[in-house]
Curated annotation (Swiss-Prot):
InterPro entries: GOLIM4. Plays a role in endosome to Golgi protein trafficking; mediates protein transport along the late endosome-bypass pathway from the early endosome to the Golgi. Glycans are attached at residue 229. Residues 565-587, 631-640 have a biased composition (Acidic residues). The chain crosses the membrane at residues 13-33. Residues 399-423 have a biased composition (Low complexity). Residues 80-175 are annotated as: Endosome targeting. Residues 122-143, 253-653 are annotated as: Disordered. The lineage of its organism: Eukaryota, Metazoa, Chordata, Craniata, Vertebrata. It is a single-pass type II membrane protein; Lipid-anchor. It comes from Rattus norvegicus (Rat). This is Golgi integral membrane protein 4. It is found in: Golgi apparatus, Golgi stack membrane; Endosome membrane; Membrane. The modification Phosphotyrosine is found at residues 574, 631.
């Protein structure tokens, strides 16, 4: 039994372990599957990205291949033309052997002059660089001064803003203190108003009593002494310019004391009927005088309101004081009236006790609790309204301050954006000016080369052309279009004496000047053929100039389109110079061989040579300019081939 139980337990344990391993294996497989799915999605995204990149590269490569095919076609065409020009040039070399040495000497002298001019232009270029560095330093100093001034103004602005905020907080404190004082004065005015209502009830009772006493005939004729007392009481006037705010509490206490002492005096001193009548007469005269007295106080009230309005406007919160009833002058009048009435009441101490008790009871029970509650609610509503007005004013001031700050920030941002736009526009204009200068210098160089080639007819300027190309490439490597323009202008000016020398050399090899030729008819026929061939030569010259201009414009566009290509100009120039030197050496060797062969043939058969010259006189005279044009086209083709090779190499890069 024990073994069976153990085996069952072990079996259950094994089953649970197996189940757990299966579950964990399933979970691990699910996690591995999810991880592989995520990696697969990432790999698909990367593959899609690389596929798009490959498509873009293939499109770019297709464009490059198309450009390469066009360049190869143009190169093949130029090679054919170059081959044809070389054949013509070899024929031309035999005839131009004598003029070659002279052309070399002229080209050497020209090269020395151009070299001197090049050194001068280099010195000018260094001076311009120094001036540029000085201007950059001055610009940097001005920028530092501007930043310093801007920081100073910013600090000053922040300081002024802090000072204004402090002043504003102080003004708010003063406004709060003035409001507290106004609230206290309103409270005091409310107390005095309640006392005034009590006194009004007493005055009404006094009038009733006076009417009853006037009906009695014994009280209608007072004694002269009593009239003097009445006039004496009538002669007491209220004090003018009495300050309520300073003596308000003292008057209230005095009024309380007089009001409390009035019943006691009535009980202690019974007055005669004449004194009562005199008191009532004094009250009547007081009521007649009292309407005149507020006129003087009204002026003081208006003056005081104007002063308070000015104080409120300085704080930034001008309030309409007409809406807020300020009762300080009225309180003054009422206090004075109460005092007069109390003085008159002292004369009426002899009236019956029942009337006095009735009047005091009416005075004490005049204001009901409902009226007091309404008055308290009115005061609370007024205080809430004032607090709400103060909060609204503070919120308006805060919003105004925030609006001002936002406006200042917007103005500052607009100023900075305007400065950035002006700077960008200036940079853009400067770049356009530089590009126009480079383009103008390039076009001037092309025109000068074309004019110089047209003037130098009959001179194979192989070495001189190589020197000019070297100098031109050096100027382009230096990247100074102004120097390149000045470099070609003296060359154009110096072309006139060289052209005259070339014409003299061409006239030397003219068959008309040859002593062996004696046929004048042949010379006339040659002149006629030359005149007929002039239009054809002009057309060919125009075509060659247009072709040369197109090649140079393509080169300029390629150089301007890719700024990285401009950095490789110097290395390519050195390579091209080396290749040209090798080609020049080969051509010089061929020239020597041809000269040697020509001398041998001339020494063996001089008559045949003369005959050949006579036979070739007409075509030589007819095509001297054509050969020169072929020579110039050969140079242009060499330049175009070099440019095509450069562009092809850059396209491959």
């Amino acid at each position: 039994m024990g073994n069976g139980m153990c085996s069952r337990k072990q079996k259950r344990i094994f089953q649970t372990l197996l189940l757990l391993t299966v579950v964990f294996g399933f979970l691990y497989g699910a996690m591995l599957y999810l991880e592989l799915q995520t990696q697969l999605r990432k790999a698909e995204a990367v593959a899609l990205k690389y596929q798009q990149h490959q498509d873009s590269l293939s499109a770019q490569l297709q464009v490059v291949y198309e450009h390469r095919s066009r360049l190869e076609k143009s190169l093949q065409k130029e090679r054919l033309e170059h081959k044809k020009a070389k054949e013509d040039f070899l024929v031309y070399k035999l005839e131009a052997q004598e003029t070659l040495n002279k052309g070399r000497q002229d080209s050497n002298s020209r090269y020395s002059a151009l070299n001197v001019q090049h050194q001068m232009l280099k010195s000018q270029h260094e001076e311009l660089r120094k001036q540029h560095s000085d201007l950059e330093e001055e610009h940097r100093k001005q920028g530092e001064d501007f930043s310093r001034a801007f920081n100073d103004h910013k600090q000053r602005y922040l300081q002024l803003q802090q000072e204004k905020e402090q002043e504003l907080s102080k003004l708010k404190e003063t406004v709060y203190n003035l409001r507290e004082e106004n609230r206290q004065l309103r409270k005091a005015h409310q107390d005095i108003h309640t006392q005034l209502q009590d006194v009004k009830t007493q005055v009404a009772e006094y009038k009733q009593l006076k009417d009853t006493l006037n009906r009695i005939p014994s009280f209608r004729n007072p004694d002269p002494a009593e009239q003097q007392n009445v006039t004496f009481t009538h002669g007491t006037h209220p004090p003018q310019g009495y300050n309520v705010r300073e003596k308000l509490t003292g008057e209230l206490q005095e009024g309380q004391q007089n009001h409390d002492a009035m019943p006691r005096r009535m009980e202690e001193k019974p007055l005669s009927s004449m004194q009562k009548e005199a008191g009532f007469q004094a009250l009547e005269e007081q009521n007649q005088v009292e309407p005149r007295e507020p006129e003087g106080r009204q002026v003081e009230e208006e003056h005081r309101k104007a002063l308070e309005e000015e104080e409120m406007e300085q704080v930034g919160q001008a309030e309409h004081l007409e809406e807020e009833h300020d009762p300080s002058p009225e309180e003054q009048d009422r206090e004075w009236r109460d005092q007069r009435r109390q003085n008159a009441a002292h004369l009426l101490d002899g009236r019956p006790q029942a009337e006095i008790e009735h009047s005091t009871k009416a005075a004490t029970n005049f204001r009901s609790p409902y009226e007091e509650q309404l008055e308290q609610q009115r005061l609370a509503a007024r205080r809430d309204e004032e607090a709400q007005r103060l909060r609204e004013h503070q919120e308006a001031l805060h919003q105004q301050r925030l609006h001002g700050q936002l406006l200042r920030q917007q103005q500052q941002q607009q100023y900075l954006a305007r400065e950035m736009a002006q700077q960008k526009q200036a940079d853009h204009e400067e770049g356009q000016q530089q590009y126009q200068l480079r383009q103008q210098a390039h076009s001037d160089a092309v025109e000068n080369d074309v004019a110089q080639g047209a003037e130098d007819q009959g001179i194979p300027e192989e070495e001189g052309g190589a020197y000019d190309r070297d100098n031109q490439r050096q100027d382009e490597a230096e990247g100074d279009p102004g120097n390149r323009q000045e470099f070609h202008e003296p060359g154009h000016q110096e072309g006139d004496p060289e052209a005259e020398a070339d014409r003299a050399a061409a006239q030397d090899i003219n068959p008309a000047d040859d002593p062996n030729n004696q046929g004048e008819d042949e010379f006339e026929e040659a002149e006629q053929v030359r005149e007929e061939n002039l239009p054809e030569e002009s057309e060919e010259r125009k075509q060659s100039e247009a072709k040369q201009g197109n090649v140079e414009m393509d080169e300029h566009l390629v150089m301007a389109g890719n700024p990285d290509q401009q950095e490789d100009n110097v290395d390519e120039q050195y390579q091209e110079e080396g290749e040209e030197e090798v080609q020049e050496d080969l051509t010089e060797e061929k020239k020597r061989e041809l000269e040697h062969n020509a001398e041998e043939t001339y020494g063996e058969n001089p008559d045949d040579k003369n005959n050949d010259v006579e036979e070739q006189g007409v075509p030589n005279r007819a095509h001297p300019k054509g050969r020169q044009e072929h020579y110039e086209e050969e140079e242009d083709e060499e330049d175009g081939a070099a440019v095509a090779e450069k562009s092809h190499r850059r396209a491959e890069m």
